[in-house]
């Protein structure tokens, strides 16, 4: 990480850093003949019983650099809640298909962005949240109980000269306005 030398790791980039980190971890695991997950637990001294499986986040609407649709948020995600992974995957699939039908019904394009989520031309970022909430309900699930929302804001992508260009490339927002917007969303949506 120190090789990059920048505060936000922009010189090497997250993809390169992640790839090298994973390669080093795999090499370490292979050298001691352990599965990767056991090696990582050993290196970080994680007790066998003291761990949680990662939460499954599914990217279902793309914006930012992943889609040419005017949305500044890079990834709108759903996080299905269930004990079994296969059920979380099934729930996500149902919601994804419900969103496809909803977008089509409302006249939005159903093409996908670089990350596999839909890339509709929406009026604003919040409209993406509203459509996902609607799709969750259409699929028969309860937002905030069965399914939660996640966002990859990727704010560094629209930050220039001390301001955020969140809603438009011409209107600058101070950090305080961004924070207030996200606070309102957290109250309004199960993020």
PLM ranges: what are they?
Residues 7, 15, 65-66, 118-119:
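Gly/Ser/Thr-rich beta-alpha loop segments that engage phosphate groups in nucleotides
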Residues 9-15, 59-60, 112-113:
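Short glycine- and Lys/Arg-enriched binding-loop motifs that mark or flank ligand-binding interfaces
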Residues 21, 40, 59-62, 79, ...:
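Short beta-strand segments
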Residues 1, 35-59, 146-150:
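Beta-strand segments within the central parallel beta-sheet cores of soluble alpha/beta enzyme folds
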């Amino acid at each position: 990480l120190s090789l990059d030398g920048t505060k936000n790791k922009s010189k090497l980039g997250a993809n390169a850093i992640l790839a090298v980190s994973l390669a080093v971890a795999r090499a370490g695991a292979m050298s001691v003949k352990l599965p990767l997950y056991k090696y990582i637990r050993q290196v970080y001294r994680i007790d066998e019983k003291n761990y949680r499986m990662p939460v499954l986040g599914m990217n279902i609407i793309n914006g930012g650099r992943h889609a040419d649709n005017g949305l500044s948020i890079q990834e709108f995600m759903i996080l299905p809640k269930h004990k079994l992974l296969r059920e979380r995957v099934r729930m996500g699939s149902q919601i994804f298909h419900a969103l496809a039908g909803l977008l089509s019904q409302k006249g939005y394009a159903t093409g996908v962005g670089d990350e596999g989520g839909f890339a509709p031309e929406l009026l604003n970022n919040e409209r993406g949240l509203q459509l996902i909430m609607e799709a969750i309900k259409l699929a028969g699930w309860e937002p905030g109980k069965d399914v939660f929302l996640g966002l990859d804001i990727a704010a560094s992508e629209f930050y220039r000269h001390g301001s955020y260009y969140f809603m438009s490339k011409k209107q600058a927002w101070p950090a305080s306005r961004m924070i207030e917007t996200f606070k309102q969303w957290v109250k309004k949506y199960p993020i």
